[in-house]
Amino acid sequence: MMPDMQQVGQAQTQQWAPEINAPVVLLENVSKTYGKIHALSEITLALSGGVTGILGMNGAGKSTLFNLLMGKLKPSSGSIKLFGTDPWKNPAPYAKIGFVPEHEKMHDWMTAHGFVSLFARLNGLTRDEARVEADRVLDFVGLTDVAHKQIGRYSKGMRQRVKIAHALVNDPDLIVLDEPLQGCDPLARTTIMNVIRELGKMGRTVLVSSHILHEIERITEQIVILHNGRLLALGNLHAIREKMDNIPHTISIGCENPKELAKDIINNNAVYGISFPRSDNLQVQTHNLNEVHRELPSLIVENGHIVNSIDNPDDDLESILNYLTGGFVS
């Protein structure tokens, strides 16, 4: 989506090209305030290539960040550069962005092919070029077989894929997806995750927001964590988890004989507590999650235990936020 041109000013008339070696997205001390409310506070980050998960609870600032990147909002302070260019001085970089908004605004009476073709025409393609491009992007998201059916007959997951397809008609180098998995069934989630991963493998810079940790984990380990408008973490999710190894964790194990399994697990030096919440469940308390998980498979097999599930109930986004904020998550 293009910004309000009256706010941006006149586009530069000279030919534009991305700055070589510049980050695709660069924010320097960016803040956005509404009166006394700080939606984002002094965010600095640089992103280029591959998939990055933008994590945060509701109200963390994810949508505000995306609206700033898309030019729908202007920073209260700080600077934003896309492909090395300040888009508020020259809006040309917006032509290289594809945006998938959280909310649906599609015409249910249109076919997916007609809807996507329309956006291709709006990007300057001829009628024939738009048809070819619509075929290409709908095939990429796996909707070729139903491309000429009305969108109103689509499931939630199919509608989400139409939104992704329409964001790809300009062959963007930066793709921004706001909560693309929300409301989708498991099969649709897997399909959309595969599409997002494929875009990352193609070298595109992909930003995907979510408030659900395991969704992002299935797509990428490169994350940005926002909380109350502030940047809490930027980097590899695995590295953040390693830093959390010295704090208490719970492992929940569904099994046929919890007490027999407990006799073997309690010998692990990293285990400091055992409990039996149900007749088919064992809960293990540990200060070293990785060590226990490393030993569990061989311990289970060698001793003939029948295990149905292994889960970490406290290994979620809220736990990471508690760790990063010292337990002061509000």
How should these model regions be labeled?
Residues 78-93:
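Conserved ABC transporter NBD signature motif
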Residues 175-179, 184:
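Catalytic Walker B motif of ABC-type/P-loop ATPase nucleotide-binding domains
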Residues 117, 121, 128-146:
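Conserved ABC ATPase "signature" region
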Residues 57-61:
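Walker A (P-loop) phosphate-binding loop of ABC-type ATPase nucleotide-binding domains
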Residues 70:
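Helix-to-loop junction immediately C-terminal to a conserved catalytic motif
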Residues 193-285:
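ABC transporter nucleotide-binding domain
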